[in-house]
Amino acid sequence: MNRIRIALVASLLASGFLAAHEEPFGYVRGAQTEPPGEWEVTQWTTARMGKESGHYLGMDFNTEIELGITRRLQMAAYLNTRYHHLRDVEGSEEVFEDRNRFGLDGGSVEIKYQLLSPDNDAFGLSLYFEPGYHSIRGISGQSGSSIEFETILILQKNFFAGRLVTAFNFVVEPELEREDGDWETELEMAWTAGASWRLTPHWRIGAEARLGTAFPHSRLNSAEYLAFFLGPALHYQRNSFFGTLTVFPQIAGWPDAQGTGGLHLDETERLEIRLKLGIEF
């Protein structure tokens, strides 16, 4: 009987350890870091669909190579490409030019440092910093230079030996964008949260939410828009391979086409779908 109890405890501890470095979300970042010397390659594919009228499809392709440096520090590099297909598109207020284009969109570098571990401490806490350069406008698909400095405060709390994973991110992203030869500033902010439940040893199901806004010229008293997304997330992991699918419809936004509340379809879309496929070495 004691042997059975020991085996059950060992199994629970092992399952928690194996799940310690999972990222079961498509949009929400976890507080885990890769073990020293471990590599991970992830392909991110995000489809953004639907404006007020017309045909709109934006595709973001991000190839990530990640490396654990120390027990608390990891770094990564991203190579980004984008595809846009726009025809007769109107947003809440903006009219977009027709476009059918695929192109290289620059890259970025990630630095993530873990202050508290979600497995060994009361909760997980990490700081994330990602400077990057873009050569294609994310919404319109036009050529244009921008430099971003994404900074994230990451909180994570695990329950039931890691069977339930919850996480919260506060995102601050200053941006420099070149317009007609001059550099203009913008500040984006987002609050994201997620919960993921382990159904089987390999499958997780959960939900993610994001509230995003932006402040032109970094003036905090003049928000450009608000957009709230909420949707399900499905995660699969077996050995060193994993995949995550998040379906993210916009639930509410401001201003809409009437200038009130509804869906904001200038800086955001009706629906986002993100697929992450990765393998660890």
Task: Show where each model-derived region lies.
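Transmembrane beta-barrel domains of Gram-negative outer membranes and organellar outer membranes
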Residues: A20-E280
